[in-house]
């Protein structure tokens, strides 16, 4: 609220980004209304409310993952469905895992394990390639895909190292077992009116940051 450029600090009464009320780098412009595309989604039998790929372990030989889904069965009765997990690396050969499940009416939590052999690790900027895997989850009912959700993920380990040393205690990060000097900067909105920021402006800015 202290950043509010108005005498009466009104920002505490609304759920908006604080910078809308002014900052040392920006004007006060409290906007309202629809500013992103609106979509209406229709479902025949079920929807995937959430899909998360949890990394359980990572070695040079394999990555053990858990595909965690929250599926909403919108029908009034339980249904037999098939859950398909598809994943590939750099649009290469696709691996498919299939499991038959009973979906009760309402929300259902489903956990499906998967394994990536000889995983290629994601690496930070300047260290190597930021390798990404494509994952998708599908709900199949009566032979038809009724819901689908996709993600791109990187496989890597990150560890905060707090160990006693000559000066007291260390504080640094290891990424994939390699000590990393973390550096960065604050990113602020590129315009007081966010819809005026084009995809090209975002791409140009973050490309410049990456190459700096």
Predicted regions and their residues:
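Secreted/periplasmic carbohydrate-active enzymes, especially glycoside hydrolases
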Residues: 1-212
């Amino acid at each position: 609220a202290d950043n509010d450029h108005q005498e009466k600090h009104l920002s505490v009464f609304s759920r908006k980004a604080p910078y809308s009320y002014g900052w040392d780098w920006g004007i006060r412009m409290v906007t309202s209304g629809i500013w992103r595309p609106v979509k209406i989604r229709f479902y025949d039998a079920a929807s995937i409310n959430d899909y998360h790929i949890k990394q359980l372990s990572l070695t040079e030989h394999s990555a053990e993952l858990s595909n965690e889904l929250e599926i909403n069965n919108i029908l009034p009765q339980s249904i037999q469905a098939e859950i398909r997990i598809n994943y590939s690396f750099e649009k290469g050969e696709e691996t498919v895992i299939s499991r038959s499940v009973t979906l009760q009416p309402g929300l259902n939590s489903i956990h499906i394990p998967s394994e990536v052999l000889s995983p290629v690790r994601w690496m930070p900027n300047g260290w190597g390639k930021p390798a990404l895997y494509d994952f998708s989850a599908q709900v199949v009912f009566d032979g038809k895909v009724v819901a689908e959700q996709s993600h791109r993920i990187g496989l890597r380990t990150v560890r905060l190292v707090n160990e006693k040393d000559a000066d007291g205690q260390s504080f640094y990060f290891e990424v994939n077992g390699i000590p990393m000097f973390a550096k960065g900067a604050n990113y602020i909105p590129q315009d007081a009116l966010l819809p005026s920021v084009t995809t090209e402006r975002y791409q140009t800015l973050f490309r410049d940051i990456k190459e700096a």
